[in-house]
From Swiss-Prot:
Tree of life domain: Bacteria
Any Gene Ontology CC annotation: cytoplasm
Entry similarity comment: Belongs to the P-Pant transferase superfamily. AcpS family.
HAMAP family: AcpS
Residue ranges crossing the lipid bilayer per the database entry: none
Main subcellular location: cytoplasm
Keywords carried by this UniProt record: Cytoplasm, Fatty acid biosynthesis, Fatty acid metabolism, Lipid biosynthesis, Lipid metabolism, Magnesium, Metal-binding, Transferase
One protein family per Pfam: ACPS
One GO BP annotation of this record: fatty acid biosynthetic process
Protein name as annotated: Holo-[acyl-carrier-protein] synthase
Gene (name only): acpS
Lineage: Bacteria, Pseudomonadati, Pseudomonadota, Gammaproteobacteria, Enterobacterales
């Protein structure tokens, strides 16, 4: 296995909160997949939930080397937790097509947050 990409992102949670205060749920609609949206709607800390998802998706886009453009969208990267609570990534649409084209066989996700920040790293392996 070879490392195909590595991406890291850090998000200031207060910035996400400010955007939600100004524009309502538009950011969440743009960033979250349908499954994530269902969780966000009833989450006890929706701003923190969104900030963490945003960080993972930005890190993933960086790992792919593309950023969010050329057909890639935030909601094509879905963050979920396995049975032990470990964050994982599921890809849809153009993100899945790109992963297949690059030969991505494994995606590793780490996610951390504290009072003011959420941070994520994504590693893509062949």
């Amino acid at each position: 296995m070879a490392i195909l990409g590595l991406g890291t992102d850090i998000v200031e949670i207060a910035r996400i909160e400010a955007v939600i205060s100004r524009s309502g749920e538009r950011l969440a609609r743009r960033v979250l997949s349908d499954n994530e949206w269902a969780i966000w709607e009833s989450h006890q800390q929706p701003v923190r939930f969104l900030a963490k998802r945003f960080a993972v998706k930005e890190a993933a886009a960086k790992a792919f080397g593309t950023g969010i453009r050329n057909g890639l969208a935030f909601n094509q990267f879905e963050v979920f937790n396995d049975e032990l609570g470990k964050p994982r990534l599921r890809l849809w649409g153009e993100a899945l097509t790109l992963a297949e084209k690059l030969g991505v066989a494994h995606m590793h996700v780490t996610l951390a947050d504290e009072r003011h920040y959420a941070c994520a790293t994504v590693i893509l392996e062949s």
